């Protein structure tokens, strides 16, 4: 049997040799591929046909070593230089710039096809754009276009910095695509256009390459506890750079979106690394309700095709299905699935560098099954242990990508027809099914967020119309499915067998705090009175009335705090106060938190109104008779650990986008002490782990571990720097944090960080709550104000929605429940429900009708998403205000600064900053 198997492989090899039409095989390169592959089953013969080209340099000729060679990875400047060489030496390669990262590095796309494809690239892009809009292209016209059009296949790599194989592999693949005369490669070159995004996140990639050469290259063991990842990837965002597809806030996402809308690729394939040995995405489900059935079926067909091709070449460990679900639409590559294309991804096993390690797979499970078990979706599993090299990773990913490109090359017309048909289906649904449109009134509590919602829809390619008083979004358009998905609540199945891969709710009106009306019919709408928006909209606030004082009606608008900082920067003498309670002034009601500005002038207020989208009323009223709090804007610090910077990065990004000044601090600042002399507020964003991890940080046995910018490692030291990442603040730093609060400071802790602060005793009245069987993946749920006199809830109604994921709960003793400012759900905790039974010695009292009516009217807890056993959380604390000494600890048991997405929740943090010294 073994001899027969080897004979088949030998036959395949000779067939490939015959295909290259007497091209000279690069024996040195191919031998090195063998040398750095640890097992012959990890290397298909199809990759051993790399040729020597007289004009086009191979990676070996260019770099002096092959791709996947032990100990070698390349910075973006080196990667781009190689592609530039290909573009200069081959007419089949086009290289174009696609913008800049936050740190100033370039994004590029590399386009590969035959000479005709490159020469007529604009024509092919025009054809896919026409197929993308069924309103402009009839079925008959589409068929004519399909006859001459070519599918565009977009392949991206390097989104996650530690996943280091694919950016290297793509250089070898590009060389293969432009030099090989093998039949299957020629088909790819001639029948499709391949677009390569060589490094999706250049900032993170360069940091990680420097990290590898500085700290991890040559380490003896993979699982020795040493951090395999650099602490920062992008300037702000770590792994969540692949969770930005709804916000489109980071440069990486903007570049991906720009590429999609320029090329309208038929398929997008994002290359990642995690599970063994090669996962081809389909997902376990449940699938997103608004992904066209054609796309869902394409996932299955293409996924199984790729796994079959890898298996056909004798490579074990390829599988589909048992990883990821297919629900959350905010991944980067989902720009394809959300816009009638096909978004897919691979996960290849990786070592976070170019070293070889013995890896143990024996306990790894996915979808409940061992990674080494033989299943219907994994017909040829890997052994419980594998000796895994960098080149193994290159082989697997490249084999899969070539198989996928070949599928597109041989099924191009079907893929193009499906692409058009999905857009056609979306338009038809918009025409025949409800909702027919959505209207967004401009006059709302936060008009700037109304404009933001309109802009965010346009970022997604959704058409928005405008009249004098509202925005109108018609459903009869190519991205109708995405529109309805974004604007209506999600209902995740409670009986789903496997836990969701990410958040399960994303209803933008709730996340933004904007009222939206869904229209079942368009009757009565004069569509000619609306104009199509072609550029970003902005709400310019207005100033009415007359007088020397200016008052702003506060309704938890996101831009109030930034406006106050801007005013103080322009005019240090400006007087700022806020109303402590609701007041009637000149027959107009102003709620608690409304801002009164004096010692300024009309021009400054007009500038604030226009810049920040806020309305003011000039008044000559005597405000001294109203109870007010003078505003002393705080000096804010945002704390970051060196072991988990994900959410700290989102917090920094949010503060910078809003225009709220802050200082970034770490363990060394806490250890140095004297915090209150420098800061009034310290924010600790969500951080993983427990109190022990928070105190100790990165294991000091690995120190010193510098993260500093040097000539040898120029990408390090950004956005923060330290001579030694190891160790944490220690008990001394925690005591300094306690003293900061006792001296009058405000400590704000978000989600898991709040639990850590409670565990450390910094919020002594708070204790952890056993949540039992509660399962609370990221969903939009109801919260209720318990203490309306607290300025933290200024601008919020009694009940409102928030976004919450799985996180720890906290609680106080019953006699301290006044520390609870907001609770989950509308019903009280069981120990707060009045006893209604008989009491010995007292006359029985019947349950009042009023109480019964109130119970019947309580709102559902889940607004969008799904929560199992919600009774375990209803009544528990959402926000606590704990006095400590002269200061306060404000504990949020959810994250109000989640991924720059839940903007409606963030003003509770802004309220805390405005009122930091008035929370007693």
Positions of predicted regions on the chain:
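Conserved beta-strand positions
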Residues: 270-271, 684
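Active-site-proximal cap/loop segments of hydrolase catalytic domains
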Residues: 111, 205-234, 238, 254
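Bacterial Sec-dependent N-terminal signal peptides
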Residues: 1-24
């Amino acid at each position: 049997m073994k001899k027969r198997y080897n004979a088949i492989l030998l036959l395949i090899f000779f067939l490939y040799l015959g295909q290259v039409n007497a091209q000279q095989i690069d024996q040195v390169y191919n031998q090195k591929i063998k040398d750095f592959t640890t097992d012959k089953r990890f290397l298909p013969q199809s990759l051993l046909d790399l040729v020597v080209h007289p004009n086009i340099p191979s990676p070996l000729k260019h770099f002096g070593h092959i791709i996947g060679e032990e100990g070698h990875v390349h910075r973006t400047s080196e990667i781009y230089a190689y592609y530039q060489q290909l573009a200069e030496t081959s007419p089949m390669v086009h290289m174009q710039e696609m913008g800049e990262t936050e740190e100033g590095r370039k994004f590029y796309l590399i386009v590969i096809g035959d000479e005709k494809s490159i020469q007529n690239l604009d024509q092919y892009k025009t054809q896919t754009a026409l197929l993308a809009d069924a309103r402009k292209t009839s079925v008959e016209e589409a068929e004519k276009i399909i006859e001459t059009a070519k599918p565009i296949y977009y392949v991206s790599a390097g989104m996650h910095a530690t996943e280091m194989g694919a950016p290297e592999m793509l250089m070898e693949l590009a060389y293969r695509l432009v030099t090989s005369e093998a039949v299957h490669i020629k088909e790819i070159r001639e029948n499709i256009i391949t677009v390569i995004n060589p490094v999706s996140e250049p900032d993170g990639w360069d940091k990680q390459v420097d990290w590898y050469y500085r700290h991890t290259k040559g380490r003896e063991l993979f699982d020795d506890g040493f951090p395999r990842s650099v602490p920062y990837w992008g300037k702000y965002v770590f792994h969540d750079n692949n969770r930005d597809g709804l916000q489109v806030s980071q440069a990486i996402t903007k570049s991906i979106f720009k590429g999609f809308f320029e090329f309208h690729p038929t398929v997008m394939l994002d290359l990642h690394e995690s599970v063994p040995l090669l996962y081809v995405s389909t997902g376990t489900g449940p699938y997103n309700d608004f992904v066209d059935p054609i796309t869902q079926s394409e996932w299955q067909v293409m996924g199984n095709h790729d796994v079959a091709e890898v298996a056909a070449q004798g490579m074990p460990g390829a599988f589909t299905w048992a990883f990821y679900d297919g629900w959350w639409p905010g991944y980067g590559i989902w720009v394809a699935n959300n816009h009638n294309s096909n978004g897919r991804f691979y996960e290849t096993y990786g070592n976070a560098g170019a070293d070889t390690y013995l890896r143990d797979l024996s306990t790894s499970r996915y979808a409940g099954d061992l990674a080494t078990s033989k299943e219907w979706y994994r017909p040829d599993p890997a052994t419980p242990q594998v000796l895994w090299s960098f080149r193994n990773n290159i082989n697997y990913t490249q084999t899969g990508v070539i198989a996928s490109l070949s599928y597109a090359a041989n099924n191009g017309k079907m893929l193009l027809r499906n692409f058009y048909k999905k857009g056609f289906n979306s338009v038809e649904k918009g025409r025949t099914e409800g909702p027919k449109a959505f209207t967004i009134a401009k006059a709302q509590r936060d008009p700037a967020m109304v404009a933001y919602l309109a802009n965010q829809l346009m970022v997604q390619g959704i058409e928005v119309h405008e009249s004098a008083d509202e925005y109108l979004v018609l459903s009869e358009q190519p991205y109708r499915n995405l529109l309805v998905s974004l604007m209506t609540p999600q209902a995740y199945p409670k009986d789903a067998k496997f836990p969701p891969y990410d958040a399960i709710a994303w209803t933008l009106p709730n996340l933004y705090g904007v009222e939206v009306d869904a229209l079942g019919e368009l009757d009565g709408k004069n569509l000619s009175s609306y104009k199509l928006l072609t550029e970003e909209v902005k709400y310019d606030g207005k100033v009415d009335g007359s007088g020397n004082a200016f008052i702003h009606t506060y309704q938890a608008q996101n831009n109030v705090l930034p406006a106050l900082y801007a005013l103080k920067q322009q005019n240090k003498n400006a007087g700022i106060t806020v109303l402590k309670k609701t007041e009637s002034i000149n027959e107009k009601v102003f709620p608690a938190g409304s801002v009164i500005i004096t010692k300024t002038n009309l021009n400054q207020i007009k500038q604030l109104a226009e810049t920040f989208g806020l309305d003011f009323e000039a008044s000559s009223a005597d405000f001294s008779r109203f109870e007010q709090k003078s505003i002393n804007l705080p000096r804010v610090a945002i704390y970051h650990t060196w072991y988990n910077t994900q959410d700290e990065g989102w917090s920094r990004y949010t503060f910078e986008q809003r225009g709220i000044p802050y200082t970034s601090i770490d363990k060394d600042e806490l250890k140095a002490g004297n915090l209150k002399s420098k800061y009034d507020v310290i924010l600790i964003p969500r951080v993983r782990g427990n109190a022990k991890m928070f105190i100790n940080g990165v294991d000091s046995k690995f120190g010193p571990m510098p993260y500093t910018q040097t000539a040898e490692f120029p990408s390090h030291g950004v956005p923060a720097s330290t001579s030694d990442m190891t160790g944490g603040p220690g008990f001394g730093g925690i005591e300094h944090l306690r003293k900061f609060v006792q001296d009058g400071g405000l400590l704000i802790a978000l989600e898991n960080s709040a639990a850590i602060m409670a565990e450390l005793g910094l919020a002594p009245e708070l204790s952890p709550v056993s949540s039992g069987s509660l399962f609370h993946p990221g969903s939009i749920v109801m919260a209720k104000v318990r203490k309306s006199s607290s300025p933290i809830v200024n601008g919020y109604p009694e009940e409102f929605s928030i976004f919450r994921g799985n996180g720890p709960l906290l609680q106080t003793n019953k006699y301290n429940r006044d520390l609870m400012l907001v609770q989950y759900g509308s019903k009280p905790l069981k120990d707060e429900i009045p006893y209604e039974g008989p009491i010995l010695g007292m006359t029985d009292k019947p349950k009042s009708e009023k109480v019964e009516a109130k119970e019947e009217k309580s709102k559902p807890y889940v607004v969008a998403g799904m929560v199992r056993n919600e009774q375990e959380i209803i009544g528990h604390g959402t926000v606590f205000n704990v006095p400590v000494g002269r200061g306060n600890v404000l504990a949020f048991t959810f994250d109000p600064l989640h991924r720059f997405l839940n903007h409606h929740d963030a003003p509770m943090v802004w309220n805390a900053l405005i009122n930091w010294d008035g929370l007693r």
